[in-house]
Amino acid sequence: MYLQLQKVRGNKFLATGPTNFQAWSIARFIEQVAAAGKAEYPLPLYINVALRDPLTNPMATHYESGGATDNVIPIWKVAAPSIDLLAPDIYLSGSERILKVIDLYTRADNTLFVPEAGLIADNAKYFYDVLAHGGIGFSPFGIDDNGDSSNDEHLAERLAPFAQEYAMAAPMMREMAQWVFDDKIKAVVEHEDGAEQSIKLGAWDAIIKFGSGRGGELKPNKDHNGKAMIVSLDENKFIMAGTNCRITFRPTGSNAGKAWQYLKVEEGWYENGVFKSLRILNGDETDWGGPAIGDKPRVLQISLVVR
């Protein structure tokens, strides 16, 4: 019956009716359970979503239809109001596909929360993008498992990219929460083609190139795991974090085309709401294509000036 309806031309309801009906039915059942639970113990509730491919609009026979997939989010929001968050489990592959999921589940009525993601090194690069979308959690599956002691080395290798990001973020979690609330965080992740990307920052554009090395051409990232996050503190001052990337800037607006320079670039961390400078990067570390960050995340405070 469903396959026959898919062949109907010119009638969107007939083509999507079974999918929508399935979503409505399951969501209404979940709503009864959730509402009863909240009546006894009013905790916030979320559901894990087994995703469909957000780029290809696959037939319902090719994914777990009935769940809160991107095509039926509005139905779930109406049918299951006791569910506070529709939370995507990210087990898809490909940066374009995953970034699309992050966009689709960031809504005025749905704060982004990633309760599961594959415990693979590549997924660590999406941590910044989740933050930039106002996300309140990013939890790779099994990250809290001690694992098999006979395979500790392999487990440590898989956990390291996530552990390093969380260690970097931990001292400035309160600042990050405020930056997210104020919509000050911008992020990019490296795509499979390794192409450079840019971020608009008001009076400046930030240009991020991915790879390793300082000066000249960067050595491409084998695993395409580069990423960068930039926070606007004021018009000419920024916090940056990232891995396997290099950043430079370009003035825009009335200053477009003018000469500019780094006034100061400091590496450091936040402590009790204050940036603590560990060291000031010298000219050789900033002038040859901009500050570069290797395979371990660092936090930089960057001040710029137009000459």
What label would you give each PLM region?
Residues 21-23, 59-64, 88-90, 202-207, ...:
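Short linear motifs at secondary-structure transitions and domain/linker junctions
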Residues 27-28, 67-69, 119-122, 220-223:
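Short amphipathic alpha-helical surface micro-motifs
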